[in-house]
A protein has these predicted regions:
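Short acidic-glycine-tyrosine-enriched beta hairpin
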Residues: 62, 92-109
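N-terminal post-signal-peptidase region of extra-cytosolic proteins
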Residues: 43, 60-66, 74, 109-113
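Glycine- and acidic-residue-biased ligand/ion/polar-headgroup-sensing regions
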Residues: 73-92, 102
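Membrane-topology and secretion signals of cell-surface/extracellular proteins
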Residues: 30-34, 50, 68, 88-89, ...
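A short beta-loop-beta micro-motif enriched in histidine and acidic residues
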Residues: 49-54, 66-78
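Ligand-binding loop in jelly-roll beta-barrel domains
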Residues: 109-134
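A short, N-terminal "cap"/entry segment at the start of jelly-roll beta-barrel domains
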Residues: 2-9, 13-56, 105, 139-142
Length: 142
């Protein structure tokens, strides 16, 4: 029953126009939609985990030429690139390149690596839609 209600609310939320969800706009308030989708960037549908919901947000910085190492996320996550150029690669060689101002719905349960391909640090904010007690990232074992 709980999953059904969560699914209903997700459908309702995703079908509202952005301006319904926005603050009252005027000269001092500007709203810019970043992304709206039902799938991660590899085309897989977004599925929320069962359990007590927990949202986690973090700021990440990746030095020029550095990479995250191969890893995976068991829960949906959403990133916004604030600075630099980030390249995300899957094991099947699909690549997504992101610039400052672009958003990404990350892949779930799929190994991937992020790499700074620019000459300035990549800065991004990342939000996970997880559950209490669940790890957000698992590093690939060598």
């Amino acid at each position: 029953m709980k999953n059904t209600l969560n699914a209903i609310w997700a459908v309702v939320f995703l079908h509202l126009p952005f301006d319904v969800l926005a603050l009252e706009q005027g000269a001092a308030v500007s709203v810019t939609p970043l992304i709206r989708t039902t799938h991660s960037w590899d085309g897989q549908p977004i599925v929320y985990p069962a359990g007590q919901a927990e949202i986690t947000g973090m700021s990440i910085e990746i030095a020029p030429g550095a990479e995250t190492g191969w890893h995976r996320h068991p829960v949906p996550s959403f990133a916004v690139i604030l600075q630099g150029t980030l390249e995300v690669k899957l094991k099947d060689d699909r690549v997504k390149r992101l610039q400052a101002g672009e958003a990404l719905i990350e892949v779930v349960n799929t190994d991937h690596v992020g790499r700074n391909v620019g000459d300035i640090p990549v800065k991004l904010v990342l939000f996970y839609a997880g559950v209490v007690g669940q790890a957000l990232t698992t590093q690939e074992k060598p």
